[in-house]
A protein has these predicted regions:
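Bacterial N-terminal signal peptides that target proteins for export
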Residues: 1-11
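Bacterial N-terminal signal peptides
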Residues: 10-20
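Short S/T/G/P-rich N-terminal loop/turn motif that feeds into the first structured element of a domain
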Residues: 25-74, 100-105, 127-192, 205, ...
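Short, glycine- and small/hydrophobic-rich beta-strand elements in well-ordered beta-sheets
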Residues: 70-92, 118-133, 188-213, 227, ...
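Short, charge-rich binding segments
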Residues: 86-87, 104, 117-119, 152-154
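Short amphipathic alpha-helices in soluble, non-transmembrane regions
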Residues: 107-115, 226-232
Length: 264
């Protein structure tokens, strides 16, 4: 191998080992992930065909630039990533962003699309929602509240699923007590899966074409399948005017791993 080739390989390796930093303080990250009033965005992308025609070193340089940008924004945002390629025909990868202001997410995504890597991204889905305090849980029986607070037994989960939902007009016309009873039945059906399927809800009315974005993580897709079948059998499900379309399925992966995969 000549000196020029060795130097080029050294540069490529050095660029690839740049790591992406997450929020500097764990407490800030925890608050963004758990507090109400936080905006969540799911941005799904495909790589365009021109990306794969680039020489390897050009892809490495482009990926390195994207990593540095993500590091710059990681002090104010929580940025999580998922590999969809091979499991979903909607996108190659997805980013979930939590921010106190949706404009901060917009600034990050706009900056990302302006990088050499971002110019090869084709956005396939943008889903926006807001975290809120539980509307129905305070009215549940004490035993159900206690069960909902049980910690998950499986901390590491490999798969993520995003399902947007739109309710019909009849749902919003129901009085609070009727909706409470329906959601209690919904929750009772979901309780057996609490320890194997992690869930997070985002409210999207007015922010998107949906009313809710449901986010799931699990190690066992068969348990997730059983959960959905159980929820399809409760009365509340009949008020779902739209369930999915798109449904995004992927694996939870560090963004460094995803970017390096696309740099090869």
């Amino acid at each position: 191998m000549n000196l020029w080739a060795m130097g080029r390989m050294t540069l490529m390796v050095a660029l690839l080992v740049v790591t992406t930093a997450w929020p500097a303080r764990a407490t800030d990250r925890d608050k963004l992930l758990t507090d109400p009033g936080v905006y969540g965005t799911f941005a799904a992308f495909q790589m365009d065909h021109d990306w794969w025609d680039l020489p390897g070193d050009a892809r490495v340089i482009a990926v390195s630039e994207a990593k540095k940008l993500i590091e710059q924004f990681s002090s104010q945002l929580v940025i999580e990533s998922y590999l969809l390629r091979g499991l979903s025909d909607h996108a190659d990868f997805m980013i979930r962003v939590h921010a106190h202001a949706l404009s901060d997410t917009q600034q990050f995504l706009t900056s990302l699309l302006g990088t050499r890597f971002g110019r090869h991204l084709v956005a396939t889905s943008y889903l926006h929602g807001l975290t809120k305090k539980a509307a129905y849980v305070p009215g549940f029986p004490d035993q159900m509240k206690k069960e909902l607070q049980s910690p998950s037994e499986v901390p590491a989960k490999s798969y993520a699923i995003v399902i947007p939902i739109r309710k019909d007009a009849d749902w919003w016309a129901l009085d609070q007590d009727t909706r409470l009873a329906l959601m209690q039945e919904h929750t009772q059906a979901a309780l057996p899966y609490l320890n194997v399927v992690k869930r997070k809800l985002y409210h999207s009315s007015g922010l998107d074409d949906f009313d809710f974005i449901t986010y799931f993580e699990t190690e066992k897709l068969e348990e997730f399948h059983s959960l959905i079948r159980a929820l399809e059998q409760v009365k509340e499900y009949r008020h779902n005017r739209r369930f999915g379309h798109p449904t995004l399925l992927g694996t939870v992966r560090p963004l460094d791993d995803i970017l390096e995969l696309f740099a090869r």
